[in-house]
């Protein structure tokens, strides 16, 4: 079952983490590469963020992977999909080279643009417009989203936090899970796998108006280091569970269209024609399928149970997403920091706006980091932060009396990524209002 002689991106990540003297030093180094880390005890979640250039193989694994730090090293608990790129997005040479070392066949696309790089069969998988939730085993079945270790984030609907709902994604998932599946489903799951679901729900709508809540299995991956971090087809695992349960459990799956590749169509980048061609086929697979759907993921198996994915979003979806998302300075800062602007940035004017935004953010972070380093060094010469942390913190606070953005400095001192991001959102919003909306 497992793929042989494959070194997965998460193994590159482990190798990189092991090169540092401590998790704290590793996290700090990754942060400078645009990889954010959320920490709960000995658990670490790695998620790419603003500024990640995706020029290292281990960057691909940082899409919500959760690892545990042990005395003997790092253990993978959950490993969702590797990073997959938007159609037409340029890939860094190291990433292209990595995929080419795994490929069955020669590359189709010589310009390093995300798309069908390989002359291999492909399938188009329905891209659901929901929330990715991963189920993994750690002394019991637990879940996380791609941005939260415990899935305790607030529900977002139409791009806005639904403050009227006293629920988290974790509560919404288990509530939906209990409605859709029998509780004994968990007994049929493989504890050496993590299960990647897409949760769609009227109360967590983005664009597509799903009328009924649902949980759809979109991916399965081994987290057994001895066998390898290979993927298992969702339909394959669904059939196994269906058979083992005597036909009592029927996992929901996304619509999948398998077809021979049309390289002329894709090389010409005529995506509108592609959607005109495949939308009726998808509608035939899913009864009552909406014409306006998010799009699809094009999947190619480039080595045994190793997949290369490209996401292609429906033009109408992109336009509706633009309309649904109120682009206030605060919302723009939020989308930018969450690395989600690629969902709707299309026009040259918008591309120019993003470039300005990057300049504003880079300037802001450089100023903050420079000030932090200066203050930290200055106070460290007076009192040791290790030997007398209380006095150090007191002097640190006094030194910040005249600073507008004290919360960022304390979050940076404590290594609290979530508070840093919250503070950065506030600061970036202020700078956007001055720099882009004046």
Swiss-Prot record:
The active site is at 127 (n6-amp-lysine intermediate). Optimum temperature is 64 degrees Celsius. One of its GO terms (molecular function) is ATP binding. Its EC number is 6.5.1.-. One of its GO terms (biological process) is RNA repair. Optimum activity is reached at 1 mM and 5 mM for Mn(2+) and Mg(2+) respectively, with Mn(2+) showing 90% of the Mg(2+) activity. ATP binds at residues 48, 63, 83, 198, 311, 313. Gene3D superfamilies: 1.10.3550.20. Keywords: ATP-binding, Evasion of bacteria-mediated translation shutoff by virus, Host-virus interaction, Ligase, Magnesium, Manganese, Metal-binding, Nucleotide-binding, RNA repair. InterPro entries: T4-Rnl1-like_N. The record marks 198, 317 as: Essential for RNA ligase activity. It is an enzyme of class 6 (ligase). Optimum pH is 7. The keyword Methyltransferase does not apply. Its cofactor is Mg(2+); Mn(2+). Mg(2+) binds at residue 342. Involved in countering a host defense mechanism which, following viral infection, activates the host induced anticodon nuclease and shuts off viral translation. Repairs 5'-PO4 and 3'-OH groups in the cleaved host tRNA. This is RNA ligase.
């Amino acid at each position: 079952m497992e793929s042989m002689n494959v070194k997965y991106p998460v193994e590159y990540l482990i190798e990189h983490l092991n090169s540092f003297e401590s998790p704290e030093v590793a996290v700090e180094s990754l942060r400078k590469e645009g990889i954010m880390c959320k920490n709960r005890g000995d658990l670490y979640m790695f998620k790419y963020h603003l500024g990640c250039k995706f020029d290292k193989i281990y960057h691909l694994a940082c899409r919500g992977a959760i690892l545990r730090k042990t005395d003997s090293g790092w253990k993978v608990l959950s490993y969702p999909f590797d990073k997959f790129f938007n159609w037409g997005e340029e890939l860094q040479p190291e990433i292209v080279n990595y995929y080419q070392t795994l490929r069955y066949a020669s590359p189709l696309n010589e310009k390093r643009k995300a798309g069908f790089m390989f002359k291999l069969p492909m399938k188009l998988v329905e891209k659901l417009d929901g929330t990715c939730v991963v189920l993994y085993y750690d002394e019991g079945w637990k879940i996380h989203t791609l941005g939260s270790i415990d899935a305790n984030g607030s529900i977002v609907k139409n791009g806005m936090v639904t403050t009227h709902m006293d629920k988290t994604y974790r509560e919404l998932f288990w509530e939906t899970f209990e409605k859709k599946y029998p509780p004994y489903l968990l007994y049929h799951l493989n504890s050496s796998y993590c299960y990647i679901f897409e949760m769609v729900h009227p109360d967590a709508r983005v664009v597509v108006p799903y009328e009924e809540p649902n949980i759809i299995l979109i991916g399965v991956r081994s987290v057994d280091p001895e066998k390898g971090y290979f993927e298992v087809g969702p339909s394959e695992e669904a059939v196994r569970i269906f058979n083992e349960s005597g036909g009592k459990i029927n996992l929901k799956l996304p619509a999948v269209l398998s077809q021979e590749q049309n390289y002329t169509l894709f090389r010409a980048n005529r995506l509108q024609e592609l959607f005109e061609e495949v939308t009726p086929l998808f509608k035939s697979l899913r009864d009552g399928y909406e014409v306006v759907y998010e799009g699809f993921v094009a999947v190619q198996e480039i080595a045994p149970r190793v997949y290369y994915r490209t996401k292609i979003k429906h033009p109408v979806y992109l336009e509706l997403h633009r309309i649904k998302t109120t682009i206030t300075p605060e919302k723009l800062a939020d989308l930018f920091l969450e690395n989600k602007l690629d969902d709707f940035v299309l026009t040259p004017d918008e591309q120019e706006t993003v470039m300005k935004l990057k300049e504003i953010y880079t300037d802001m972070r450089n100023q903050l980091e420079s000030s932090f380093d200066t203050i930290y060094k200055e106070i460290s010469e007076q009192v040791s932060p290790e030997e007398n942390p209380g006095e150090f913190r007191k002097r640190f606070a006094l030194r910040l009396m005249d600073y507008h953005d004290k919360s960022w400095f304390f979050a940076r001192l404590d290594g609290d990524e979530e508070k840093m991001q919250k503070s950065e959102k506030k600061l970036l919003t202020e700078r956007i209002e001055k720099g882009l909306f004046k």
